[in-house]
Amino acid sequence: MKMSVVIATKDRQHALERTLASLEAQVGAPPFEIVVVDNASVDATRRVVDDYARGALALRYVAEPEPNRGKARNRGVEQARGDFVLFCDDDVRCPPGWIAAHAAAHRGSTDCVVNGPILNVASYESRPKPRLVNYSQAFLCTCNASLSKRAFIAVGGFDERFDLYGWEDTELGVRLRQSSISWKFAWDAYIWHVKPPEENTLAVESRKAIEKARMARRFLAVHPSARARLATGAYGVNLLRARYLLPDSLLALYAGAASSNRAPAWIRALARAQFLDGIYARELVRALDVADAG
């Protein structure tokens, strides 16, 4: 058994360097390689990869000039030499037994998708253990998932029409589920997803919410089911709420509370969640209206 860790990255040289350091410290793993797909970076990503490639890691650099997460990961799998591919993001810290845990979950099984807990942390030094709240029924999450290269290719890989943030891994998960492949959640295959507050600003998350809403429309076009409408929020009551109960004044109130240093932390968190949900819902209505008009 050989594993290929596929990492798509764009302009995250410092985060990528820490991710590679954690992969260099893996123990008990079967033979593995790392394929870093540079998705049109303008920073020193290539230098970081070259530096680590001179060390103990079996590491290869692949360039994908078109900014597109799905396309970058497809390119990485094309270049992968392992029997199994593991996906992780460029801003994670992998515990020393991460690859070994994924490999163990695949041994003795027919083709399956393996997901592990994703623990969002504010700093690279934070290393909590997984709890029940970290369980996820998502069929595939590219921050921490593995499957055979054969199964990935059999369903066609990522749909490269998902060219903005959101839904590309969910869409691939739908096709994998439809292929009748089995699914496992491996508690010991956990990973820390580093999200520093200074990078996780309201402006950044707002942009992601807008992009995710636009990709939700594409997801619904590919999978026009009741389950998909529920998952994306494109159902009657929620769409009515977005049209008539989310005025600019209310979103401005949420944004102000989310940014207030005088408000308690729980108020800021609640206001932030409400603001981002409102941004997503209103953009989803716009995206669906454009699709209907077309």
Describe the function of each predicted region.
Residues H14-E17, D43-D51, G97:
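Acidic helix N-cap motif at the loop->helix transition within catalytic regions
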Residues A145, A151, V155-G156, F162-Y190:
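A short, conserved alpha-helix in the catalytic core of glycosyltransferases
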Residues P96-P128:
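Conserved donor NDP-sugar-binding/catalytic core segment of glycosyltransferases
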Residues V85:
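Short aromatic/hydrophobic "clamp" motif used to bind/position activated sugar donors
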